[in-house]
A protein has these predicted regions:
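Soluble "head" domains of membrane/secretory-pathway proteins
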Residues: 2-38, 57-58, 62-63, 71-217
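Hydrophobic membrane-insertion alpha-helices, especially the h-region
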Residues: 42-58
């Protein structure tokens, strides 16, 4: 029987034939490097924009200046302030807040909220702060920094002891050395721009500032 021969050559029948398959064209090294640079630059710009937005609208790093909040906050410590919280939540007693000083709004102060709108604040004979006649828990105070509480309270103006609407009575934890509402009166709500949330420096004291149960040793 005669073998039928078909035209064409099959590659597996002839070792002398090399099949070259088309390959993807390699990108020029310069083009690849430029693309990488653009990608990194884009990511850096995005990160910078996000950082600016966070600082402007949400969280701001703040340096503590002074000793009025000892022992909870020491001079030169660094903290983060939440500037977003009070847009949606009420200011609560015991929170450490940052605000514009009413007598000079170019300066920022940091104190603890003691009296809320509508409350009457006073001090009992033992030197304990009372709200509407009831003593409040201030276990965050260090006794050695609260020796002259009664004496300093005697100088508080009577009209400051009733906290009117949209105002707050604030005090430093270092009661013997704090310039606060006892000396210059109430803080308008519109002047309070943030809550102290977290201490990030020094590292050995890093942590949340939310707790009011105990004073820091």
């Amino acid at each position: 029987m005669k073998q039928i021969t078909y035209p064409g050559i099959a590659p597996e029948d002839d070792a002398d034939i090399e099949i070259i398959y088309p390959e993807a064209e390699e990108a020029a090294p310069t083009a690849g490097l430029w693309s990488e640079i653009k990608s990194i630059t884009r990511d850096i710009i995005f990160a910078a924009v996000m950082a600016v937005l966070i600082v402007v609208f949400v969280v701001q790093p703040v340096k503590v200046e002074g000793t009025s909040m000892q022992p909870r906050l020491e001079n030169d410590e660094r903290i983060f302030v939440n500037k977003f919280k009070y847009n949606f939540e009420p200011i609560e007693r015991g929170e450490i807040v940052v605000f514009w000083f009413p007598d000079d709004p170019t300066k920022s102060f940091i104190k603890r909220v003691i009296g809320l709108p509508g409350e009457t604040i006073d001090m009992d004979p033992r030197g304990h702060i009372t709200i509407n006649g009831i003593p409040i828990d201030e276990s965050y105070l260090a006794p050695e920094r609260n020796q002259n509480a009664r004496e300093k309270w005697n100088s508080v103006r009577s009209d400051w002891k009733y906290v009117k609407a949209h105002y707050y009575f604030v005090m430093g934890d270092n009661r013997d050395a704090s310039n606060d509402s006892r000396s210059w009166g109430l803080v308008p709500e519109k002047y309070i721009y943030g809550k102290a949330m977290f201490r990030y420096w020094p590292l050995q004291r890093m942590g949340s500032l939310d707790s009011t149960s105990n004073y820091d040793e």
